Structure formats: structure tokens, C-alpha cells
Amino acid sequence: MPTVNQLIRKPRIAPVKRNKVPALQANPQKRGVCTRVYTTTPKKPNSALRKVAKVRLTNGFEVIGYIPGEGHNLQEHSVVMIRGGRVKDLPGVRYHIIRGVLDTQGVKNRKQRRSKYGAKRPK
């Protein structure tokens, strides 16, 4: 434990906080246009074809967003809304595309956790 004199000479420094979603610029969501929609494979223990889209945001950032749920209608030039939230087994994917907003349709036949996938209440 340092003495008072040592702390006066060299004070404690707080660790630097790193922003995990810099492209949002302190906004909850951002709008963007898909420039490329494709599938990619996850990191080592997992195996799948994950659906992702490269999105050019309104502030000029170009980010990769994950498309959650089963099936989607996105293609190049689709206008999407993006939120923060990384996908742990896809390096470089730090954003999620919000389903049921703008050009993105909700997931069909979704019964549970509907609000997360933009699905309407079944009749």
C-alpha cells in the first residue's frame, strides 16, 4: 500500500473506459443502408452459417450487423435500424439489426419472445 507522499508524487490513474459501440455515437439506435448481405462462419467450437449484413450508417460509419431469427428479407439497399450488442462467436460483429423496423420484416410464426423479433401477436 503506498504512502501519502507516494500518492502525492504519483497519483492513482483510473482505467480508460473503452466504448464498445462507437458507431452509434451515444445514440440507442442508428439507421443505415445494407451494402452487402451474406453468411459467415463462427469461431472454433461452433459451426453454422450466420446471416450478417454490412451496413453504411447515416453518420458515415460502415459496420457489420447480425440478422437475428430464422429467415429474413434483407438485400442490398435495404434500409435497416441497428442497435448495439455483439455476437460472441462472430469476430467483428458488434451490432444487431432490429427486426420489424423499416425494411426488415419480423420473424414469421414466432410465438415466444415476439418483441425481440418484431412478430405480431398471433390471432
UniProtKB/Swiss-Prot annotation:
Stored InterPro entries: NA-bd_OB-fold (IPR012340), Ribosomal_uS12 (IPR006032), Ribosomal_uS12_bac (IPR005679)
- What GO terms in the biological process aspect are recorded for it? translation
Q: Which residues carry this modification: 3-methylthioaspartic acid?
A: 89
Listed CDD domains: Ribosomal_S12 (cd03368)
Coiled coil start-end: none
List GO terms (cellular component aspect).
small ribosomal subunit
Quaternary structure annotation from Swiss-Prot or TrEMBL: Part of the 30S ribosomal subunit. Contacts proteins S8 and S17. May interact with IF1 in the 30S initiation complex.
Name the family the entry cites: Belongs to the universal ribosomal protein uS12 family.
Which PANTHER family does this chain map to?
30S RIBOSOMAL PROTEIN S12 FAMILY MEMBER
Protein known as: Small ribosomal subunit protein uS12
This chain's source organism reads: Brucella anthropi (strain ATCC 49188 / DSM 6882 / CCUG 24695 / JCM 21032 / LMG 3331 / NBRC 15819 / NCTC 12168 / Alc 37)
